[in-house]
Amino acid sequence: MKVTKAKATENRAALVQAAGSLFRERGIDGVGVAEISKKAGLTHGALYAQFPSKEALAAEAFAAAFKRGFERMTADRNGRPATLTDCLDWYLSFDHRDNVATSCAMSACVSELARQDKVLSERVTEGFERLVAVMERGLGASSVKAENRQRALAMAAAMIGGVAASRAVAKADPKLSNQILRAVRRIVGEVGGEEGQVDGPRGRPRATRKRARGAGSPAPSSQL
């Protein structure tokens, strides 16, 4: 039976979502097309009807993951535009670290992205540049444009690396994992002009799940 255009679009979206989730959970090289198809509720044939290769699917899956991530990070908070503080709180949170399948694709797969093909590298570069742009907008007119670019590059790289490092040690040393996130959140906040206004990651630490979520909100910073 011929697949309708609407159904083909639905199938493509399901494959992209399934691939994005699995790649972040288990790595690009750790997932095969059979598993992706199964998670999407489709067959091999349906996957290859949409994508010529796993690499092509990965490129689209990462692009879609970046888009959804930036939408969450920069979404309005209680009717007001998101600030730099809001973005840092979201990215460098315990919840973001612990929910790998829906997290930033770069922080989830950073160690293996350099081994992938050029097309995926281009999507990753676009995603990284967009994160840098968000940081630059958050910095606003606090310094000259060239300096803002340097600060934004350092902030974006520290955020990605901080989440990745925090995850890497979490099973063996939850306390160290939490310390990494707190330290990166504080330093990145200082680089972004938040010195004295940072409460640390939001959510409950891995090693202290029974403790209540910390009260108090950081003072707002530049709107994005």
Where are these regions (language model features)?
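N-terminal intrinsically disordered/low-complexity leader segments
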Residues: 1-10, 194-224
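Hydrophobic alpha-helical connector segments
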Residues: 60, 71-103, 155
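Short, basic, alpha-helical segments at the C-terminal edge of helix-turn-helix-like DNA-binding modules
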Residues: 63-69
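Hydrophobic/aromatic-rich alpha-helical bundle segments in the mid-to-C-terminal region
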Residues: 118-126, 130, 139-200, 206, ...
